[in-house]
Amino acid sequence: LKVRHVLAALAVSALTAQLVTLGGAAPASAADAKAPVNVGLIYSKTGLLASYGAQYAEGFAVGLDYATNHTGAAGGRKINVTERDDAGDPAKAVAAAKELVGQGYKIIAGSTASGVALQIAPVAKENNVLFVSGAAAADAITGNNRNTFRSGRQTYQDVLTAGTIVGSNLRGKKVVVYAQESAFGQANVNAVRTVLGGAGATVDPVTAPLSANDFAPFSQKIKDAKPDLLFPAWAGATAPAMWKGLDDSGVFASTKVVSGLDQRSSYETMGSAATKISFLSHYFYLAPKNKANDALVAALKKQGKVPDLFHPDGFVAAQMIVHAVEKADGEDVGKMIAALEGWSFDAPKGKQTIRAADHAMLQPMFVAKLEGSGSNVTPKLLRTIPLQAVSPPVRPFK
């Protein structure tokens, strides 16, 4: 009898073991069963564009949660994010990218500064990794190589939006581009010459070093030029001083000023200049009405924040990476590239499309004005410009 009991117990034990082997007992989730995906996020945690970098990183975290349906996994693979600070320095960014690539990372994202993005792009090509540039706006990022994508807008889209503000009657008009001596600044000069110069305007630049903090000489030079239109293209912490210099010199009383709407902290610091400018806008959270933007607003509200200028760039980068990993079922770079080319999706700004021919991020833009005074200055949407109207020309891959 004891023998029969022992045999029966052994049989049950064997059957249980067989079922565990065949059925897997499934104590682990699908994400545990597949290798995780490592993403390197290289952006400006410090430096001139640190506030933009913070927005990008926060947007990426919210976008990753949104795109993975709160699981942090894509296609059953956990997404691990490693952050590196480039401080806006291309050399630091390239070193960080090479370090991560050397550790086996197949996906790099970030780049707050255009000069940084333009140096990481060739690293991505040489090492065959996926690179999704962030807030960096230089046109040369588009069409750089098939490994390089962007999650934000590009300068040409800014200038095309500005063109909808100034109209088509530019023949014989004088336009001055006021920009920093940087890749971003030069990209704006080039784009204005192409778009507004192509419409008949004469375009001249006035540029200031990135290190400048006294803008009176540049403001006076602009006033003396007597332009019909001034297009300031500025980024970073010195913007308030730049605007004050223009206002103090009386430029707003003598010329029409069109510029990009900067981050929210700039509204109050622009002083009396705020309501004197016509703004093209990449993004402000009151403009779009859609599910993705609602999710971004709600997630940041829980943190006591509201979305700012570059939160969507991080959000979209996460959407792109999740989509690429899901469609590739892993980190096959060729498959991830193919998955992103031509992809249309709903982003915080609205419907966006990655153009297959050069990886331009086609997206709507906005025209706005600032209302109020002091700490109560807020943007008001005047109109949304559909993506078809602000699509940049194709830049074939190198």
Residue ranges and their predicted role:
Residues L1-N38, K398:
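Short, low-complexity disordered leader/linker segments with a strong preference
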Residues A31-D32, P36, S51-Y56, Y66, ...:
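Beta-alpha junction/loop-to-helix N-cap segments that form part of ligand/metal-binding clefts
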Residues A33, V37, P348-K398:
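Solvent-exposed, acidic/polar segments of extracytosolic/periplasmic ligand-binding ectodomains
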Residues A33-A61, R84-A91, T112-G115, Y178-Q186, ...:
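Extracytoplasmic "Venus flytrap"
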Residues L41, L100-T112, V132-G134, K174-A179, ...:
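Periplasmic-binding protein-like
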Residues D86, V132-S133, D139, L210-S211, ...:
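Venus flytrap/periplasmic-binding-protein-like
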Residues A95, G115, A138-A140, N147-S249, ...:
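Extracellular/periplasmic Venus flytrap/periplasmic-binding protein
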Residues G245-F315, E326-D329, K380-K398:
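Extracellular/periplasmic periplasmic-binding protein-like sensory domains
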